[in-house]
From Swiss-Prot:
Disulfide bond annotation, renumbered to this chain: none
Stretches with biased composition (Acidic residues): 919-929
Start and end residues of each stretch annotated as Disordered: 910-929, 1033-1217
Gene coding for it: WDY
Protein name per UniProt: WD repeat-containing protein on Y chromosome
Stretches with biased composition (Polar residues): 1041-1054, 1085-1107, 1137-1179, 1198-1210
Biased segments, Low complexity type: 1181-1190
A Pfam family the protein falls into: WD40
Length: 1217
């Protein structure tokens, strides 16, 4: 949307330019032109006589000023001109008596406090909350277990009744709901209708309870019965009366006769016998008026003949009878307003003065059934009534008019349910409806100021304008409201509802307002709606002056009002011109040439020079304002290319066809524009995908030359392009105006001298750009005082690190970004600037219009319930040194930059750097001097400084370890852990010394041992080489055999121990592929394991658990197991593993044991620490598959640990055991 601020005219130039001129001094503007505070009744009478004696009873500008001076009312030239324009509503520069009196009346109406409390939305606008009652039968009674009394003392009444700070809906503040059903069941609910507990009790028919929170007077318990009697029990709230806790008595039962006899001395009884002749329908005791109210229904009209006392008010010994036909079913007493609202079977709602019982002050009609519930909101001046058909009506308490009819309960509650109970919670402003269901209806809920500052409109704000003549702000919204605000006091002056409407099937539908502007003298308001309608308003008296329309169901996106002409454009893709000359207003409008191929999104005007329009497809056309002829055409995708202003016959035909298709199918206007262009013609417009234009702005102070950038074009890509509207000008520069992906500028404004550019983005950011030296010739550029800008804009001050907004423009010298902050949660649709007080205002899609200082301080939201800041139209806002608050909704999502700009506080960050030695010595001397002075003149405070106080316990220094329960088969949490496979480790190159001993046989260095091996010794005798007895054929007793091939039998070892075939313990060590190491507790054995006899514990391996593989070419071999017990097999730490190669068959079986330490008595086979490592390579095939085998341990010792055996089996066919 475009904001048009201009003033022009060819007649009465003195009045126009003296009023709207930007050269008026501040001294001339300080005097208020308001006449209401300076005129008296005698002066008004003398003015009336002057008007009657004037020719034709009208006076001109000079004559009217003379008349005011004759009655001692003197104004300056500037102030009087403003006053005359306000009075002259007919726009003829002549004033009569009716215009003068109308101006005075409207001024006094603006000061009426009742106009401030008119609601923007319906009293009941939120959806009701429905839930089950959890009772077996329908609810017969509903009440509130109160914590706070409804009867608030008058001295405690404040002006903050319409807003809350949160937390009021807790049970401690709002109490609990209590429901009862016919089966005697009680249920307690929270304020949010969450069940708390239930109980069983006997039902009670009619009861009322009155109390004060501070306990100033006795509490009253009022009882009404079927016979028309009323009884009152009074007791002190401090002594709790009958509710005292007595030991051993959980329930106290007594009769009324016992109470009268004084069985409970704390109770003060009082009774009114036969107060009514019928059943008591409702009772209430007012502590403020010290009066009892009791009502009854008198349905027997023949018996009472309409003279029944429907309601009786008893105060001391005085009785006031409110006689109502058919009696009273329900009533409500408002002690703040001193009124009484009654409702009965006659379908009428009556409003009474509590002290006048002769006749009601008002009778509200409109219900079609008997009234079953009434209540009053004195803060909102509203009366609510509910009839038998479950219809809720809302009435204005002062005007006695109907505001709303709410029939949603009819849809929710079944038609067979008629006995419905109602209760109004005055603290939460909620109406509770109980039957088979529980329904919660919010009635004018309070504003939560901890969440929001309030709303300006009931729908998104579309246009915000500032009127320099009346010095007020006008807001237009999508709710079809026009509201006039006084920005200096924050009050709402005028509200106009249902401004644009249309009739659909007999129902009046509101139409959204999408564009607005003022006339050149800023006396009238022009608005455009989504259905193509235009209206001219005299918004001071809410009168429509003229109705117009561009085209049916074509949205108006921009309106321009210049002298004698009105321009409107929108989805009809052309400019429509209306006459504003007296006598020719109602002629046919003029249609400009249709050169656009898509919907027009925005437009702006340069007075006396030209108009610019832009479309969704990125087309920009410059028009002559005098003739309406286009002279330049561009496309934002290729701004340097000039497009010829000529439509071919084929292009016109396609444009008409696309328009006809879009109107029939209801397609979007953006898609319709693409249908009108052939694929081969897209290249003429710059790109395949069109980029839409969101806003345009003319800089009024820049001349029309080809070197001056006078038009700013905002694109949906976040870029702002600058053009010259000269005939030989064009695209000059462009810059990025956002710092987030997907954001774009939706509205732009500037100050009076075009020094700053104010932009509002789709993400709710407000940015201010310094454009004094941007896109102008070098000779006209001026010096920029950066220290002054840093004083005005805290955003420019340095920080430790660059924020997002600064990082985006760090390589962009011009224009300079001087401020950036988040002002709204949603898109900003309109923005404007007030020059003298330096106030920036923004209207957003979040229903609010907010005021800011130029430096970014938050002033307030129009329509807020909080106190307003003191502002003046003649003083700059934000000069006083006081803390500024943040909007509650922005405070929760604000970045560090937004917090700094809005609050105006920058935290100081100091980087500590090492200082030279001399500086540190000087500082040490200064500190020593200060310490001496402190010891002489000052004493430190004694400990503890705080005296006796509670100290928080310190944090525990003990590390809290997590212990997992491993007694089960598995821990479930492990199944959720992501385990990454380990990488294959590369083998290190074999050292040369190891390669030399590969061919050596380590058995050549050992001496055969005769007899048993002593396990207590760790060394093995090594014989000399010339005494070695070697046998290649087989094994002899007492000889050690070494074999490294598959074909030689009896050369294997189990668990890394040499095989002993005889009692003499002939040792033999053999290894297959991998080495034996004590560090890993791992041994490898060949395919033919044999038995091992030793002193270690026996370990048996089952045939089904220990599997071996055979060589495919050889005969099958079965694995043998040994009953030998082996607790652990290890070597000394300094001994290296010994391995031999198996050349015949690569298939092997490996045994893996846990490295559990054993006792000294356990048998182990070890090598000497001094033995040299000997290893041989094994030519093994790569297809080896590991298989885990669980051993069976027989008779383990106490320290025996389970042994895990891993076998590596080749992928060949297994033999059966």
């Amino acid at each position: 949307m475009s904001l048009i601020y201009f003033a022009s005219g060819d007649s009465h130039a003195n009045i126009e330019y003296q009023t709207i001129s930007s050269t008026a001094t501040e001294a001339n503007q300080e005097q208020s032109e308001r006449l209401h505070d300076r005129i008296s009744k005698a002066q008004l009478q003398r003015l009336y006589e002057r008007f009657k004696s004037a020719p034709d009873q009208v006076v001109g500008c000079a004559d009217f000023r003379r008349m005011l001076e004759e009655v001692d009312i003197v104004f300056s030239d500037f102030t009087y001109t403003r006053l005359f324009l306000k009075i002259n509503q007919n726009h003829d520069f002549l004033v009569d008596w009716n215009e003068f009196v109308s101006y005075l009346i409207f001024g006094f109406q603006e000061e009426d406090p009742s106009s401030q409390k008119e609601s923007l939305i319906m009293p009941i606008s939120a959806a009701p909350v429905v839930r089950k009652t959890e009772h077996r039968s329908a609810v017969c009674c509903i009440t509130l277990l109160k914590v706070k009394s409804d009867q608030t003392p008058l001295e405690d009444m404040t002006e903050s009744a319409n807003y809350s700070f949160g937390g009021e809906d807790s049970p401690e503040n709002s109490g609990m709901w209590v429901t009862a059903s016919h089966e005697g069941q009680l249920r307690f609910w929270s304020a949010h209708m969450e069940p708390l507990r239930s109980a069983v009790s006997e039902s009670i028919y009619c009861m009322s309870y009155a109390f004060y929170n501070n306990g100033k007077t006795h509490s009253k318990l009022v009882l009404g019965d079927y016979a028309g009697n009323v009884r009152i029990l009074s007791y002190s709230p401090y002594l709790r009366g009958p509710f005292q806790a007595k030991p051993g008595a959980a329930l106290v039962e007594l009769t009324w006769a016992d109470v009268l006899r004084g069985r409970i001395p704390l109770l003060i009884p009082k009774e009114y016998i036969n107060l009514h002749n019928e059943l008591i329908s409702c009772v209430y005791y007012s502590l403020h008026m010290n009066a009892l109210f009791a009502s009854a229904e008198y349905r027997n009209t023949k018996k009472y003949r309409g003279r029944c006392p429907g309601l009786i008010m008893v105060s001391n010994d005085d009785r006031n009878n409110f006689r109502i036909p058919l009696g009273v079913s329900v009533f409500y007493v408002s002690e703040v307003k001193n009124i009484l609202v009654t409702g009965g079977p006659d379908t009428f709602v009556r409003i009474w003065d509590v002290y006048i019982s002769s006749e009601p002050s008002a009778i509200l009609t409109g219900h079609n059934g008997g009234i079953v519930a009434v209540f009053v909101q004195p803060e909102e001046n509203k009366v609510y009534s509910v009839d038998y058909h479950k219809i809720i009506k809302v009435w204005d308490l002062q005007e006695h008019t109907l505001l709303q009819t709410y029939g949603e309960l009819v849809r929710i509650i079944h038609h067979s349910e008629m006995d419905i109970k109602y209760y109004y919670h005055s603290h939460l402003r909620e109406l509770m409806v109980a039957g088979r269901k529980l329904i919660q209806v919010k009635c004018c809920p309070r504003v939560r100021v901890d969440l929001t500052d309030g709303n300006t409109h009931a729908a998104p704000v579309s246009v915000v304008l500032y009127n320099r003549l009346f010095r007020n702000i006008v807001t237009c919204g999508l709710d079809s409201y026009i509201i006039v605000w006084d920005p200096w006091t924050g009050r709402r002056k005028i509200i106009m509802k249902n401004c644009h409407t249309k009739m659909i099937y007999g129902e009046t539908i509101d139409i959204e307002i999408t564009a607005a502007c003022f006339d050149p003298l800023e006396q009238f308001l022009l608005t455009g709606a989504r259905d193509g309608s235009l209206k001219i308003w005299n918004y001071n008296n809410s009168v429509v002056v003229r109705n117009m329309s561009i085209q049916m169901d074509q949205e108006v996106t921009a309106v321009i009002w210049v002298v004698d002409r009105i321009l409107a454009m929108g989805w009809d893709r052309q400019v429509t011109e209306f006459n504003d000359v007296e006598g020719r207003e109602y002629g046919d409008p003029k249609k400009w040439a249709k050169f656009h191929t898509d919907d027009i999104t925005c437009a702006d005007v340069k007075l006396g020079e030209g108009v610019v329009t832009a479309t969704y497809s990125g087309e920009i056309i410059f028009w002559k304002l005098e003739t309406g002829q286009p002279y330049r055409r561009y496309n934002v995708m290729d701004p340097s290319q000039f497009i010829e202003l000529k439509l071919t016959a084929e292009e016109e035909k396609l444009s008409r066809r696309s328009k006809r298709i879009s109107s029939l199918l209801g397609a979007n206007r953006r898609s319709a524009s693409m249908l009108a262009i052939k694929p081969d013609e897209i290249k003429d417009y710059g790109a395949n995908i069109p980029v839409s234009v969101q806003a345009v702005l003319f800089l009024q102070k820049r001349p029309m030359t080809k070197d001056h950038g006078s038009v700013f074009i905002s694109l949906d890509t976040g870029i702002i392009q600058v053009y010259s509207h000269h005939q030989h000008g064009g695209h000059i520069k462009e810059f990025i105006a956002v710092h987030k992906v997907g954001d774009c500028v939706l509205t732009m404004a500037t100050d009076r001298k075009n020094r700053f550019l104010y932009t509002g983005t789709a993400f709710g950011y407000i940015k201010i750009w310094h454009i004094v030296n941007y896109c102008i010739p070098e000779a006209e550029k001026t010096h920029v005082c950066m220290p002054k800008l840093r004083l005005d804009f805290i955003f420019l001050r340095k920080e430790l690190f660059l924020t997002r907004a600064k990082r985006m423009v760090r390589n962009q010298p011009e224009p300079m970004l001087v401020s950036s902050y988040k002002g709204h949660l949603k898109a900003i649709n309109s923005i404007g600037f007030i020059n003298l007080p330096k106030i920036l205002f923004s209207g957003s899609h979040d229903y609010s219009c907010r005021l800011w200082t130029q430096s970014g301080r938050y002033l307030g939201t129009l329509g807020t319930v909080l106190p307003w800041s003191k502002l003046s139209p003649f003083e700059r806002a934000g000069e006083e040194n006081r803390p500024y608050r943040l909007p509650p909704d922005i405070k929760k999502v604000a970045s560090s930059t937004t917090l700094k700009v809005i609050s105006g506080v920058q935290h100081s960050f100091q980087v500590k750097r090492p200082k030279p030695t001399e500086e540190r010595e000087d500082e040490g001397e200064v500190e020593d001097t200060g310490t001496e002075m402190k010891n002489i003149f000052d004493r430190p405070l004694r400990e503890p400084i705080l005296g006796k106080h509670f100290e928080l316990p310190g944090r525990s220094a003990i590390e809290q370890r997590i212990e997992l329960d491993t007694t089960q088969l598995y821990v479930p949490i492990y199944s959720h852990l992501r385990v990454h496979p380990s990488d294959v480790m590369e083998n290190l190159p074999t050292p040369p010394i190891i390669g030399q001993v590969k061919s050596e046989n380590y058995l050549d260095h050992y001496m055969p041992v005769v007899g048993k091996v002593d396990p207590n010794t760790s060394a093995i005798n090594i014989r000399e080489p010339n005494k070695v007895i070697r046998s290649k054929a087989g094994g002899q007793v007492g000889q050690a055999r070494a074999s490294s091939t598959w074909g030689k039998p009896k050369t294997n070892s189990i668990l890394g121990m040499p095989r002993a075939e005889s009692s003499q313990g002939k040792a033999r060590a053999s290894s297959a592929k991998a080495g034996v190491s004590s560090g890993y507790g791992r041994t490898n054995f060949g395919p033919n394991p044999s038995r091992v006899r030793s002193n270690s514990p026996k370990v048996s391996f089952m045939p089904s658990q220990l599997k071996t593989c055979r060589k495919p070419e050889s005969s099958p071999r079965k694995a043998k197991t040994s009953p030998a017990r082996a607790k652990s097999v290890s070597f000394p730490a300094k001994a290296n593993p010994v391995s031999t190669s198996a050349k015949a068959n690569p298939t092997c079986t490996s045994v893996k044991t846990n490295p559990v330490p054993t006792s000294a008595k356990a048998s182990r086979v070890s090598t000497s620490a001094k033995s040299n490592p000997v290893s041989t390579s094994a030519n093994a095939k790569p297809d080896i598959m590991p298989v885990k085998i669980k051993p069976v341990v027989k008779k383990p010792s106490r320290n025996t640990a389970p042994v895990q055996i891993t076998t590596s089996i080749a992928k060949t066919k297994k033999d059966k055991p």
